[in-house]
Amino acid sequence: MKRLILLLASTLFIFNLSNAVTYNSNPEIFISELANDAIKILSDKSTSKEQKSKSIEKIALENVDVEALGLYSLGSIRKTLKPNELEKYNFLFEKYLLKNLTSRLSDYSSSQFKVLSSEQKSAKTTIVTSKIEGMDDQPDIDIDWRVYTKDPAK
């Protein structure tokens, strides 16, 4: 569980203008809509587990800078890797992230998601603090999202 919290807490989300039709440009609203879409997908009893996983993967791939998150996870080791090793790592990290995300989030399909606050770090970067409230014996998960807005003027 600690790995999930660490992974989610350090996730880099990028607001992409191509997603502007679906998600709001306000970082707090964007994160709220994104998380609520994921919870809605996971709690849909008429959808198979495989389809739920594919839908969550799609949301993640469209909104998470997986490569940047992978490089962040590598730390200074990334500087020692050869290009082919880095390419293989990026491929495997994406598979790992998506599998972990879909399997762990399925336990929170009936949970409540709340945005608690946000702090604008720069014109393009905002930290959004949120919580997924656990049900029964599940612990709450505190998540800090780093939202990067490509074009804040729009």
Each language-model region and where it sits:
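Boundary at the C-terminal end of the N-terminal hydrophobic targeting segment
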Residues: S18-N24
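Early exported N-terminus immediately downstream of N-terminal targeting peptides
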Residues: N24-L101
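Surface-exposed, charged secondary-structure patches
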Residues: K99-D144
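Short beta-strand edge/turn micro-motifs at domain boundaries
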Residues: D140-K154
